[in-house]
């Protein structure tokens, strides 16, 4: 049986080693940030302190209530992928401070992070109370981290979305697109059960755990007037961690109903609100489908239209990565006259891109693409890319600064938004040919511009303020507000014949609006049942947009004479009754009454009285050396970590031993590892060994260093070779054994959104005090590996195309390894080919090997070879199994059948009758059948399990089987075999 288990504490990508760090403190938080960002750090510290009592009020616990130490908050100022993370083991908060720019909520980014991540810090307090609190003294911070396995990401993230919605005037619960997939599904009879909505699907349109968690928890709070439901849930879990169905039991206590009756009522609570709102918005405009009907999950994004009516869309499905497609138009400006069959692929673009915009003067598409630094995972930039439609040429216009939302300014310039690492932003005018900045417009600190457009002589910006989204304009001298900020979202701001067009969820669904900047009149252009995801107007006045469908999204078209075209008042925006009820509950808990209408005026947040920011210290240098060794978890036993990562039935009993361990990692994730003591008895000699172990990784410099040492695992050994007897003698001395290794490598990797490629050079040395023919064994190694491959689609196992190679000298061997991927016969299928070759550079009586040359059907075969080669072929064929589950215990997402063939040519050391190793060929042919689980024995983590059948053969098989019958399977010659497969990633 082959098991593979990967488990580790949370290690984050690293910031650039050149950064100098500072810190600032309050009674509950210590913010660690790069030098030169003092003002930015103070903003985040004040926001975290401001919301700390409020975000924990309905949970019954706030950050610092049970864990009485300042919580480290690490600010990443060079990461353009806006996000936040709270993790325990070690406890810390990590915030990417560059504001969200792809689909931001209608609140400033620091407030969003303080609310959402602040709720997570409150949730983590549950790991320090009741049963978990007692276990904390035994295992340290590993317990709060493990306690999160009970609610899982569904409840943790859903509860955080409830908090950000209830404690603000916006949040994702007040975003029209957030739950839209559910409304389409419910309208069309798609009533998936709890497990299918909760676990999602690779093959069916399913929102993520943020959306479903909010749907369920907000429904519970409003349907049963239970604002403290999550407080009851966490309290129950901390007192009864042995209960595998805590949610069902707490829900029954809250609702008085069994789960099978309460769950439909929760969904109806939301659906009734949706249907009432849809009835209010009728009548809806007609639309015809332009995109090709498909049964596979497909998404259309980023629309643009040329002067001739050619529609340009970014399309992706579960079998293909995102690419730019064109749907041909006509000379009179009609869009999509070619019909679905006229869809034509232009180029791959990747998924990590910004909004595409069309530059008519040069027939260009311009957009931003995120490029990650080859070494530092927390450092990346957004480059401006262009695509010339007539020639099909793609190029990078600006590589230096990072920009978002590039648009046409005039015939010679484009305008783009630049977010500063120190906070603040600007709008830069860039020469379209040289890529140089020719003018820079400063943006007030109170605004975060998200989209811009140019109508001479003004630059218009849709921006976020404390009160929500609004539209401002500037001619370079001053900024003027032309559409007041309100808590709704705005997207795709464009210049349409001198007017502004944009999408907004102003009326409860994403619709398109037109704003006459001279008359100050706002017109709602579209009105559809499910709204649109992206809109663009065709030259003849038709409206093209994408909207939710059964299999993702689809491209629709509404003719110009059928558009909604009604004037509306911007201030009369849609209210969300469930979200307003959540806010009223929070106000009630805070001991004050707040009218829901007041919540939507300005930037009012539901907090409570007496929540003024705490006193903070001044900035001071953060000493990385002084904070390097941070012990966060421990164990009253010793665990063989290498054995855990490659677990087999034979080694299960050897995984844990008497002893103790301590795990350490600094808050910056540059130094991590463990130290341990083990007491073990030699079963043959009866002697007890008291050994010490250390494993350390340091990644704070360009090269990564890994140190591993084991002392007194056994006695030191000496080996001598007797030529007369052709025998190797081993002698155990009384001295302790010392084994140590040091490895250094530079993990360089690039990703342009379409291809991933990298180079990893490495060197290493291994020391042992064992004596081989009167010589201490000091083995050196050096190598380099490289790869280039496409991204792997969601429903595939392998990349569509890719190749990699490695060459390594590991004294006394030289080996080369090559692998590649090619597409299979059907979508999602693929073929992986590998070849490995090993050669001995110097003879030795002490056999070991650098590469495994045995076919996989031979299992843990003890023989090893000096020289040889191995070739393998795996054909992976994944298939949909209907997302089946067994109660709440198991949830299977798909199956995979993988026929394989391994062929080895090996050079032995003589005949097997004289104790040597036979030469010749060995092969294994067989098939793996694996199931992918997202829930396995109630634990929500990726798990694969399956079965392997194999047949062994080759010219050397008879001699190998005679020498080691355990290498075979069943049957008279042991050629057939079956083994079980299992792998998990915690």
Model segments located where?
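Beta/coil-rich, acidic/histidine-enriched accessory regions frequently appended to metallopeptidases
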Residues: 12-15, 20-23, 204-207, 231-357, ...
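C-terminal outer-membrane beta-barrel translocator/porin domains of Gram-negative envelope proteins
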Residues: 730, 771-918, 957-974, 980-986
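A flexible loop/linker signature enriched in serine peptidases of the S9 family
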Residues: 173, 177, 315-324, 348-354, ...
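Outer-membrane beta-barrel translocator/channel fold
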Residues: 510, 531-533, 550-553, 685, ...
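Juxtacatalytic substrate-recognition/specificity segment
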Residues: 7-146, 152, 160
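Acidic/His/Gly-enriched intrinsically disordered linker/tail segments
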Residues: 11-16, 86, 90, 105-113, ...
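Outer-membrane beta-barrel initiation region
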Residues: 283, 296-298, 302, 566-700, ...
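Multi-bladed beta-propeller domains
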Residues: 276-299, 327-356, 386-403, 420, ...
């Amino acid at each position: 049986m082959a098991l593979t288990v990967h488990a580790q504490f949370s290690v984050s990508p690293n910031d650039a080693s050149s950064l100098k760090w500072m810190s600032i403190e309050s009674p509950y938080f210590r913010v660690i940030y790069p030098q030169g960002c003092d003002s930015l750090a103070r903003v985040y510290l004040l926001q975290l302190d401001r919301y700390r009592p409020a975000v924990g009020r309905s949970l019954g616990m706030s950050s610092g209530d049970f864990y009485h130490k300042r919580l480290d908050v690490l600010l990443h100022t060079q990461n353009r992928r806006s996000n936040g993370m709270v993790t325990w083991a070690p406890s810390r908060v990590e915030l990417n401070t560059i504001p969200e720019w792809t689909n931001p909520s209608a609140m400033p980014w620091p407030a969003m992070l303080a609310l959402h991540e602040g709720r997570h810090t409150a949730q983590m307090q549950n790991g320090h109370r009741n049963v978990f609190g007692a276990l904390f003294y035994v295992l340290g911070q590993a317990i709060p981290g493990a306690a999160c396995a009970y609610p899982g990401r569904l409840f943790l993230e859903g509860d955080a979305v409830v908090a950000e919605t209830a404690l603000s005037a916006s949040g994702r619960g007040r975003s029209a697109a957030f739950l839209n997939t559910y409304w389409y599904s419910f309208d069309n009879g798609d009533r998936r059960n709890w497990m299918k909505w909760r676990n999602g699907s690779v093959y069916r349109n399913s929102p993520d755990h943020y959306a479903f968690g909010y749907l369920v928890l907000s429904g519970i709070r409003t349907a049963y007037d239970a604002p403290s439901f999550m407080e009851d849930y966490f309290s129950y879990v901390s007192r009864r961690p042995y209960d595998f169905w805590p949610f069902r039991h707490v829900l029954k206590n809250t609702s008085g109903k069994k789960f099978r009756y309460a769950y439909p009522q929760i969904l109806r609570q939301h659906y009734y609100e949706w249907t009432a709102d849809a009835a209010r918005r009728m009548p809806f405009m007609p639309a015809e489908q332009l995109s090709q009907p498909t049964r596979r999950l497909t998404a259309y994004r980023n629309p643009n239209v040329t002067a001739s009516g050619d529609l340009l869309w970014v399309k992706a499905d579960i079998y293909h990565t995102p690419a730019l497609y064109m749907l041909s138009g006509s000379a009179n400006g009609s869009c999509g006259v070619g019909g679905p069959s006229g869809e034509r692929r232009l180029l791959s673009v990747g998924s990590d891109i910004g909004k595409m915009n069309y530059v008519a003067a040069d027939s260009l598409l311009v957009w931003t693409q995120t490029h990650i630094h080859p070494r530092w995972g927390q450092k990346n930039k957004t480059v401006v890319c262009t695509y010339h439609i007539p020639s099909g040429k793609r190029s990078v216009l600006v590589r230096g600064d990072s920009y978002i939302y590039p648009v046409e300014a005039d015939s010679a310039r484009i305008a783009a938004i630049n977010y500063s690492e120190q906070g603040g932003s600007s709008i830069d005018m860039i020469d379209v040919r040289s890529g140089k900045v020719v003018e820079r417009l400063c943006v007030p600190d109170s605004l975060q511009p998200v989209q811009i457009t140019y109508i001479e002589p003004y630059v218009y910006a849709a921006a976020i303020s404390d009160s929500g989204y609004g539209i401002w304009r500037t001619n370079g001298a001053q900024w003027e507000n032309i559409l007041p900020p309100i808590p709704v979202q705005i997207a795709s701001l464009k210049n349409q014949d001198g007017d502004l067009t944009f999408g907004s969820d102003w009326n409860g669904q994403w619709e398109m609006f037109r704003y006459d900047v001279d008359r100050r009149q706002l017109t709602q252009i579209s009105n559809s049942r499910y709204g649109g995801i992206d809109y663009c107007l065709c030259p003849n006045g038709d409206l093209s947009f994408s909207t939710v469908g059964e299999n993702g999204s689809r491209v629709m078209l509404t003719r110009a004479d059928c558009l909604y075209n009604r004037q509306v008042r911007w201030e009369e925006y849609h209210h969300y009754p469930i979200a307003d009820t959540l806010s009223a509950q929070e106000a009630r808990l805070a001991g004050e009454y707040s009218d829901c209408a007041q919540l939507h005026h300005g930037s009012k947040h539901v907090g409570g009285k007496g929540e003024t920011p705490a006193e903070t210290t001044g900035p001071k240098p953060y000493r990385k050396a002084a904070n390097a060794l941070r012990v966060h978890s421990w164990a009253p036993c010793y665990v063989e970590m290498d054995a855990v990562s490659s677990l087999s039935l034979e080694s299960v009993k050897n995984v844990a031993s008497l002893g103790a361990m301590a795990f350490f990692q600094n808050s910056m994730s540059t130094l991590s590892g463990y130290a341990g003591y083990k007491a073990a008895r030699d079963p043959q000699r009866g002697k007890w060994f008291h050994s010490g172990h250390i494993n350390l990784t340091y990644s704070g410099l360009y090269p990564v260093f890994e140190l591993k040492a084991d002392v007194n695992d056994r006695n030191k050994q000496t080996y001598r070779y007797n030529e007369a007897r052709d025998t190797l003698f081993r002698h155990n001395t009384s001295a302790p054994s010392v084994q140590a290794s040091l490895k250094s490598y530079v993990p360089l990797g690039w990703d342009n959104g379409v291809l991933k490629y990298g180079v990893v050079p490495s060197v290493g040395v291994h020391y042992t005090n064992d004596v081989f023919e009167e010589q201490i064994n000091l083995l050196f190694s050096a190598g380099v590996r490289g790869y280039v491959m496409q991204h792997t689609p969601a429903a595939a196992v392998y990349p569509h195309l890719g190749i990699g190679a490695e060459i390594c000298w590991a004294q006394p061997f030289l080996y080369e390894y090559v692998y590649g991927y090619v597409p299979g016969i059907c979508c999602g299928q693929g073929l992986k080919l590998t070849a490995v070759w090993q050669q001995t550079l110097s003879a030795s009586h002490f056999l070991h090997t650098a590469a495994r040359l045995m076919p996989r059907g031979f299992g843990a075969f003890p023989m090893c070879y000096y020289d040889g080669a191995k070739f393998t072929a795996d054909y992976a064929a994944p298939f949909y199994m209907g997302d089946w589950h067994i109660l709440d215990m198991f949830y299977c997402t798909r199956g995979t059948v993988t026929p394989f063939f391994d062929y080895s040519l090996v050079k032995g050391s003589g005949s097997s009758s004289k104790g040597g190793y036979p030469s010749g060929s060995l092969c294994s042919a067989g098939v793996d059948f694996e199931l992918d689980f997202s829930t396995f024995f109630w634990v929500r983590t990726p798990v694969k399990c399956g079965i392997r059948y194999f047949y062994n053969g080759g010219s050397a098989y008879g001699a190998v089987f005679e020498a080691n019958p355990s290498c075979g399977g069943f049957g008279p010659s042991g050629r057939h075999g079956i083994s079980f497969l299992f792998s998990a990633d915690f």
